Every structure is written in structure tokens, then in C-alpha cells.
Amino acid sequence: KLENPSNFFRIRYAGNIPQEADVLVYYKTSPVGSTLDFDRINWTLSDPDYAIVKVQNGDDTFIDVDYSEEGLSQFDVIAVKIVMQSTNSSAIPRIRDLRIIACA
């Protein structure tokens, strides 16, 4: 639970995402004071702030990827789900340096 409610958040990670792969970022928030079971809140797909730069398989370059959601209802609980997928089992996406920032 957040100490201060927020209506904005940013997700950033360094990604190594081959051409055959993709990373999907989902989030869900709970409004301030909500008594709704958090597990019953639906996940929302977040779009990256700009096109994700993909790398050639075997390239160890990591590139920063940002997601921002603004103008949300005030929330004090947030969950993030990252789905990494690929059509080639030898070209899998990798992420590191994950940061999730909720701003008051």
C-alpha cells in the first residue's frame, strides 16, 4: 500500500527484446479507500511511451523502455504484471533494472 495516494505512475526497465519477442505490461490499481477484493480487479494493458527498439538475437544491448499512465483515479495500491513472450525459444526477451514510480 502506498503511503501517499497517486493518480500517475511510470514503469521503466532496460530491455533486451529480440525481433521475434515481445513484452506486455499490465497494471491494476485500487482506488483510495476501496473495499473491493484486489484479486477481482481486471488487468489493464499499458502501451509503451514510444516504439520498443528490438535487437538481433545474440545482441546483449539493453535499451530503456518507459510506460506512463496519467489522469487515473486516486489509488493507493498498484500491481504490475510483465508478460514476456517469443515465437522462438532461443530468442527470449530479457529485462533488468525494473523501476515502478507512483507520483503524488
Enumerate the language-model features and the residues they cover.
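Beta-strand-rich ligand- or partner-binding modules
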Residues: 1-104
